[in-house]
Curated annotation (Swiss-Prot):
Pathway: Isoprenoid biosynthesis; isopentenyl diphosphate biosynthesis via DXP pathway; isopentenyl diphosphate from 1-deoxy-D-xylulose 5-phosphate: step 3/6. Disulfide bonds: none annotated. One of its GO terms (molecular function) is ATP binding. This is 4-diphosphocytidyl-2-C-methyl-D-erythritol kinase. It comes from Sulfurimonas denitrificans (strain ATCC 33889 / DSM 1251). SUPFAM superfamilies: GHMP Kinase, C-terminal domain (SSF55060), Ribosomal protein S5 domain 2-like (SSF54211).
Length: 266
């Protein structure tokens, strides 16, 4: 098999508002935007071990907790026996090599992007014939952000618990990302939001946000106004205050901040 490098891009949340709750999950409305300058690289390489599933790369978690492995298990669950055997045979011969550039626990979707890219790699290499909608359905079992990365849009309105992804046609902004050396727990941030900050956005505001360009949205809102998780994250991780700078916005549950680079005058 000819070795090919696949890029798994980061994302930022231009805005992230909570619409309500669904059991233990929160329903959101958010504008996801791809960051072309920040990506992990994935490839299949010949295996050197007898492990059922081999990952090569710098990971801070056990294999069973890795989103790529979770995507592998979810893919097998979805496929019929014959197609599942093709996937298993592939992983008996090849390992997944990952060059990590996207910081983890940072609100940039690195793990979700890796999982989505792995699913697309398997679909392409093995000619599984899965549609984007089917891949997104599989990916949702791995994480709420995975469907966005499956579709590969530059920009999209994401709602529900992540399963509704609607392309938003606009130019990509030149995003600069800054990630403090802090590991943020997304569940803890959401739990504190529900306990102390719960104030769902109304339907009229949801529709307005879905129509506004990302550039205009950022111009009109502060970091706290744009992201409902900013306040609980700051309360939980007080060090974040020391890293916040005027003109920067907060992505996901953190810890990353981002801004739009100013165009240089020539």
């Amino acid at each position: 098999m000819k070795m090919k490098l696949y890029r798994a891009y980061a994302k930022v949340n231009i805005f992230l508002k909570i619409q309500g709750s669904r059991g233990n999950y929160h329903e959101i409305v958010s504008r996801f935007m791809r960051v072309p300058s920040l990506y992990d690289e994935l490839s299949f390489v010949p295996k050197e071990s007898s492990e059922e599933f081999e990952l090569i790369g710098s990971f801070s978690c056990k294999r069973e907790q890795n989103t790529i492995y979770k995507a592998y298990r979810a893919l097998l669950e979805f496929l019929d026996e014959a197609s599942g055997l093709h996937v298993e045979n592939l992983m008996q011969k090849y390992a997944v090599k990952v060059t990590k550039n996207i910081p983890t626990f940072a609100g940039l979707g690195g793990g979700s992007s890796d999982a989505a890219t792995f699913l697309k790699m398997c679909n392409e290499v093995l000619h599984l014939g899965l549609s984007q909608n089917e891949l997104a359905l599989i990916g949702l079992h791995v994480g709420a952000d995975v469907p966005f990365f499956i579709y590969g849009y530059n920009s999209a309105n994401v709602s529900g618990i992540g399963e509704v992804v609607e392309e938003f046609k606009e130019e990509l902004l030149d995003i600069e990302v800054f990630t403090p050396q802090l590991e943020i727990s997304t569940p803890k941030v959401y739990n504190l939001y529900r306990e102390n900050f719960y104030n769902p956005v109304d339907g009229f505001e949801v529709e307005r946000l879905k129509k506004i360009s990302s550039k205009d949205a950022l111009s009109a809102m502060s970091a706290a106004e744009a992201n409902d998780l900013f306040a609980p994250a700051i309360q939980l991780y007080k060090e974040l205050k020391n890293h916040y700078k005027y003109g920067y916005y907060f992505s996901g549950s953190g810890s990353s901040f981002f801004r739009v680079k100013e165009k240089e005058n020539i």
